Amino acid sequence: MSIQEIRHPLIRHKLGLMRRADISTKNFRELAQEVGALLTYEATKDLPLETYDIEGWCGTVSVEKIAGKKITVVPILRAGIGMLEGVLSLIPGAKVSAVGVARNEETLQAHTYLEKLVPEIDERLAMIIDPMLATGSSMVATIDLLKKAGCKDIRAMVLVAAPEGIAAVEQAHPDVIIYTASIDQKLNEHGYIIPGLGDAGDKIFGTKQKDA
């Protein structure tokens, strides 16, 4: 597995704003979309291109377009939805495959409760999105599911990653590349990333009054 920490100044700036304890739901949601878009730029920079001709204002012009596999974006519900709009702003033609994964707060293990994959997903590049890579159990479960469906080219984008989660994915799926805005320090005893962002799902959806 390859972990790519994207330290672009715009990403560092926006991530710093997201770490504020008093950030509003609106601002957190907007920043999650913006950082998601910036990560998408990095995660797709090696996509193959092909040349074709069009009629321009001055005659025939050779231009380029993305070639090869089509893309499906795979948000891990629910928090992954918070990055989806930003990702689709750059690749609007991508199909969306939703995967629902819940984590047991006592055991920190994940179980899949929803699987809505696009047809012929085995012929697509699958790009998983989830704000937090904490224990790695949700990410591993999602990759397991995608590989079972026949996916061979899988990438993941997360806002923040813990070393423990990175290690878990690397052990289970060394072929998957992860793009992240930050590799943070560690997990606490409750499985939350330190310093992290808090509960990204609650902050995106406004389900806790203190984050509203």
Swiss-Prot record:
Disulfide bonds: none annotated. Its cofactor is Mg(2+). It catalyses: UMP + diphosphate = 5-phospho-alpha-D-ribose 1-diphosphate + uracil. Belongs to the UPRTase family. Pfam families: UPRTase. Pathway: Pyrimidine metabolism; UMP biosynthesis via salvage pathway; UMP from uracil: step 1/1. Allosterically activated by GTP. SUPFAM superfamilies: PRTase-like. Binds 1 Mg(2+) ion per subunit. The magnesium is bound as Mg-PRPP. The gene is upp. Its EC number is 2.4.2.9. Uracil binds at I193, G198, D199, A200. One of its GO terms (biological process) is uracil salvage. The keyword Magnesium applies. This is Uracil phosphoribosyltransferase. Keywords: Allosteric enzyme, Glycosyltransferase, GTP-binding, Magnesium, Nucleotide-binding, Transferase. CDD domains: PRTases_typeI. 5-phospho-alpha-D-ribose 1-diphosphate binds at R78, R103, D130, P131, M132, L133, A134, T135, G136, S137, S138, D199. Catalyzes the conversion of uracil and 5-phospho-alpha-D-ribose 1-diphosphate (PRPP) to UMP and diphosphate. InterPro entries: PRibTrfase_dom, PRTase-like, Upp_B, UPRTase/APRTase, Ura_phspho_trans. It is an enzyme of class 2 (transferase).
